[in-house]
Amino acid sequence: MNISKPQQRTLHALAQGGRIELERDDNGRIISADCLTRDGWALTDCTVAVFQSLKRKRLIASQDGGPYRITRLGLANLRAQLDNRVGAKAW
């Protein structure tokens, strides 16, 4: 499955324990999608378009009205990436 770079970044943040929280208007339409890492930082690559494409591909899901998290299908389609918490130049 083809996944764009912003989608990959969002999925990696979700795989490390992050979540996507939505803001809706009075009609129930999505205004913004905020991807928060497990440390509480916001990911700027996560837009409404990225959220909708991940949801359409069933790579993320919400359970019992909670925030959106990565699914097993999302984990299976995620490409391996080194943990980006420590840069290679730091060693």
From Swiss-Prot:
InterPro entries on file: YjhX_toxin
Family annotation (Pfam families): YjhX_toxin
Domain of life: Bacteria
Family per similarity comment: Belongs to the UPF0386 family.
NCBIfam families linked to this entry: PRK13687.1
The protein's name: UPF0386 protein CCNA_00226
Organism the protein comes from: Caulobacter vibrioides (strain NA1000 / CB15N)
